A protein has these predicted regions:
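Beta-strand-rich ligand-recognition modules
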Residues: 471, 479, 485, 494-579
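A contiguous, surface-exposed recognition patch within enzymatic or periplasmic domains that forms
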Residues: 151-271
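Structured interaction patches on ligand/partner-binding surfaces of diverse proteins
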Residues: 383-407, 411
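Extended, loop-rich substrate-binding clefts of extracytoplasmic carbohydrate-active enzymes
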Residues: 31, 75-135
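A short, amphipathic beta-strand motif
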Residues: 318-328, 364, 408
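Acidic-aromatic substrate-binding/catalytic surfaces of carbohydrate-active enzymes
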Residues: 32-89, 99
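Short, acidic Ser/Thr/Gly-rich low-complexity loop/linker segments typical of extracellular
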Residues: 345-365
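A short, solvent-exposed beta-strand micro-motif common in secreted/extracellular proteins
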Residues: 364, 374-385
Length: 631
């Protein structure tokens, strides 16, 4: 048998079973007919229709997506329902041997949308991005969900979100049967009696470097966000990633969402926001997941992309360093630092501008890389220890290049005596019973109606639960060797609240001292969240005379939580004595020292104020005084 004949036979066999590998990368080819586009780079070929939807994406001759159900498409949801892009214009932005870029644009709507597609000659798949522009009527139609979806070929059933959530997705046929037995939104009984819900396949944004699907023939399609600076709500947001439907498996790149505590987006008139570019990556590999993870890391190293030209995308950025000093002597390591372009509200509800985040190291130092030039508010909150307060510093101007914020002195609210604390502050329920469980429908059935937690004897990982989900009373029993003087302060950091009616009455030795009710539904508990929804902070001050020497009881009685609702707990602590607090206005920071000597003048024109979550989940100013560091 000749070598040529053997090659022909092998090629025929591989093609027959869908394993024909694509050829090497070539120069990018772009073909345009009216508003229909075809892009190819030798490895992958993508066809985009006049509606702005990609109806085909092939690896060699192998079709990877389901064009009959939308393929790759942008859509958004409002109170009026789901809406598509509906473009009326197509522009060729760039066409070279290295890359091509096209932009589909709508020209009407309460919010104007555009979607771009980019193919390069060194990566398989396609980059895409979305530009949203506010109009005078944007407020009449708040945007609940904004996303780019990829409908996959029916055999793409190996799903991956992270190391904990991955595995086989139900087939289209299995989902068709399941959808006849709906429990709640996107939640169904499968034929074997188990429950399938897309919310099991959600993830925290900060954990998501790549998510996607692959088939048993080793072809995969992956979403690689590269940078989440553009996602509304910053690092504590949770969003949908991968799930199954009766039409097709689907991967989702959420751009904006209300899921699990987020808020609807309303852009101001003339305000523009760029989401992306992110990569929809195609591969064929003996280990598609390992390959996709490697590519994700490589893409992150290349951010910001120097090949992407857009007025909304600055290539020259700032690297911002600083040192956090916690003046009360509490931990300054493991503190989240966030730069965001909104202020005064809970981070997960932010919908304007861009976000950047990091965590302080063992010395309290931090660095934020590749920050877009602009004006920001700095948020800081602990991810470990007993600090439940929050820092905000407004009007921080970031420019290009290396910049230092110097030392930021923070005096979080603290009292002379910490009697006890259940859990550790990090805005999540981890460390409590069932909190290490993967997302799953029905977990809320496991916590008890009533419990007693004994300080010094009970263990949080066994005796305190991730959520209080049933009408009943949770009791904390503790001893005091002596009676505190003055006031005592009971603080609860909630990782979430599901169902707006969820209410806890707080009693100290049988006397009611407060009622805790966020009044907002983040849907976290019944949508499979185990660790968090939207954060809330409650702090109740009461006369220490309500306590006594010896055994004391503080109880938390849940009511109004309805079906599958309640509180997710982060931590609960009891303090007493004088407050060890002072506003940031009382402290001269290194920032001011630098400004006094002429340093940082190009960096700062800021005012600083410390604010904390209020007792009802909003924000209040501590001290009420803004300080200009550029005096």
């Amino acid at each position: 048998m000749t070598k040529r004949l053997l090659t022909t036979i092998l090629t025929t066999l591989l093609t027959a079973i869908g394993l024909q590998a694509a050829s090497s990368f070539t120069n990018v080819k772009l073909t345009v007919s009216g508003m229909t586009v075809t892009m190819s780079n030798g490895k992958t070929t993508i066809k985009i229709g006049s509606n702005g939807r990609a109806s085909s994406m092939k690896w060699g001759s192998r079709e990877l997506i389901d064009g009959s159900h939308g393929g790759i498409y942008f859509d958004y949801t409002t109170a009026q329902g789901n809406k598509a892009l509906s473009p009326s214009d197509l522009k060729i932005i760039k066409q070279t041997d290295e890359m091509c870029e096209v932009l589909y644009s709508a020209t009407s709507g309460n919010t104007i949308f555009q979607q771009g597609y980019i193919m390069r000659n060194d990566i398989a798949g396609v980059y895409t991005y979305v530009i949203a522009t506010g109009t005078a009527t944007s407020a009449s139609e708040p945007l609940k969900e904004v996303r780019v979806c990829t409908r996959l070929a029916s055999d793409m059933l190996n799903g991956y979100v992270d190391y904990r959530m991955n595995g086989k997705l139900p087939t289209n046929a299995e989902m068709a049967e399941a959808e006849k037995n709906q429990i709640q939104d996107a939640t169904y009984y499968l034929s074997d009696g188990s429950v399938y819900t897309k919310y099991n396949w959600a993830n925290f944004i900060e954990r998501d470097t790549v998510h996607g699907v692959w088939n048993n023939n080793k072809y995969g399609v992956w979403n690689i966000p590269v940078s989440y600076e553009w996602l509304n709500g910053a690092c504590d947001r949770q969003e949908l990633m991968v799930h199954a439907t009766s039409k097709s498996p689907i991967t989702i790149q959420m751009l904006q969402g209300e899921h699990l505590g987020g808020a609807a987006m309303v852009l101001d008139e003339g305000e523009k926001k760029l989401f992306g570019p992110f990569l929809i990556y195609a591969n064929y590999s003996t280990s598609p997941l390992v390959n996709a993870k490697r590519i994700a890391l490589e893409q992150q190293e290349k951010w910001p992309f120097q090949w992407f030209d857009n007025d909304l995308y600055p290539k020259k950025r700032g690297n911002v360093t600083g040192h956090l000093n916690v003046a009360t002597g509490q931990r300054n390591d493991s503190v989240r630092i966030v730069l965001t372009q909104e202020s005064g509200t809970e981070l997960v509800t932010h919908t304007h501008g861009y976000n950047f985040w990091t965590t302080t190291d063992a010395n309290g130092d931090f660095i934020l890389k590749n920050v877009r030039p602009g004006k920001y508010t700095l948020y800081a909150y602990a991810l470990a220890g007993d600090v439940t307060d929050e820092l905000q510093m407004e009007d921080i101007t970031i420019g290009e290049g290396e910049q230092s914020l110097g030392t930021i002195d923070w005096t979080p609210k603290r009292y002379a005596k910490l009697h006890w604390m259940i859990g550790e502050n990090n805005r999540r329920s981890d460390g409590f019973h069932y909190s290490d469980t993967v997302r799953q429908y029905g977990l809320w059935n496991l916590p008890p109606d009533d419990l007693t937690y004994v300080i010094g004897a009970s263990k949080p990982e066994k005796d305190w639960y991730y959520a209080q989900t049933k009408a009943g009373t949770w009791t904390v029993r503790f001893n005091l060797d002596e009676l505190p003087r003055g006031n005592a302060v009971l603080t609860a950091s909630l990782a979430g609240c599901t169902n707006a009616g969820s209410t806890v009455k707080v009693n100290v030795n049988g006397k009611e001292v407060d009622t805790w009710k966020p009044g907002v539904n983040d849907a976290a508990i019944y949508r499979s969240a185990v660790n968090a929804g939207r954060h809330w902070l409650f702090s109740t001050s009461f006369s220490a005379s309500k306590l006594k020497k010896g055994t004391n009881i503080i109880s938390f009685t849940m009511s109004g939580n309805g079906k599958n609702g309640g509180f997710l707990y982060d931590c609960v602590k009891l303090e007493s004595g004088e407050a060890i607090t002072s506003g940031i206005s009382d402290i001269q920071t290194d920032i001011q020292k630098n400004n006094d000597t002429g340093k940082n003048k190009s960096l700062f024109n800021l005012t600083g104020q410390r604010v904390t979550s209020s007792y009802r989940g909003g924000t209040v100013c501590e001290g009420g005084k803004k300080v200009n560091y550029n005096k």
